[in-house]
Amino acid sequence: IEGDYGAKTLKEIMSVLWAARAGLREEEILGYSGLKPMQWAYIRNALGPTLIDASGRLIFAHDYMRIAVSDRYMAGNNTIGNEGQSQEALKLRCNAHSKLAKWFESYAFKDGQSIVSDERAAEEIPYQWQQAKEWKKLQTTLTKQKMLIAILKHRSEQELLSYWLKLEENIKTDIETQYEKAWKKWKLDQTEEATGDLAQKLADFLSFTGRWHQAFTKKIADLALENSIHVHGNKSEITNRS
């Protein structure tokens, strides 16, 4: 296949499929690789049963394909995991994840385009930075307003917390402090309903992490309540809950 379609092209496609969290849509493969649909159709046909469609995404049919891709393009040692891999292999794996994270970021949260949905951005970008061990970039991603909203809508509080716990294992950081800094940076209009909704979601998440007694958590919980009263009056759901 490399001889027919180019070793560089095949390496790029197989490496990005290896790095993806749970496969890629064909539109994402085309966007990432820059291939034209007809070019990709020939390559896809040549790859045959090594790839399968899983809920609209292409994934490797068997683990042996993941191993083969790792061995050929990332100096792998004939195993799936990172344990026992050489420093060269680990670096190449991190590079593959980092490159995919950057691609998703370049298309994420842009109105009027459909290559990367908010749901896919929330699924892939934090995961890719974590796998790349780019801790500062992961932290920056998690404290972006649109990413926070997307994760809480399309993923879960548990998943968001898991990223922060991984961060705390590797760098000096604090969830509440980082979101307090981010909140100030966002410069939101506190009278808008969307601001109140976000404040409540963030307060709920911080409470979920065990920080319900912290000053910033209380502050945004109070803001959410005041915003709800301002927008809806005393009979709103948040008001009654509080």
Label each PLM-derived region with a short phrase.
Residues 8-12, 41, 45, 63, ...:
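Non-catalytic, well-ordered alpha-helical scaffold segments
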Residues 2-5, 35, 74-75, 87-92, ...:
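Short, contiguous acidic/charged loop-to-helix segments that flank catalytic cores in large enzymes
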Residues 82, 102, 106-109, 123-242:
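Leucine-rich, hydrophobic repeat-scaffold detector
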Residues 19, 66, 71-75, 131-135, ...:
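Short, well-ordered loop/turn and helix-capping segments at boundaries between secondary-structure elements
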Residues 63-99:
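Short, amphipathic alpha-helical interaction segments positioned at domain boundaries
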Residues 2-71, 98, 102:
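C-terminal boundary/linker of central alpha/beta nucleotide-binding cores
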Residues 3, 90-97, 114-115, 122, ...:
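Inter-repeat boundary and helix-capping residues of tandem alpha-helical solenoids
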Residues 11-20, 26, 116-137:
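P-loop NTPase catalytic cores that bind/hydrolyze ATP
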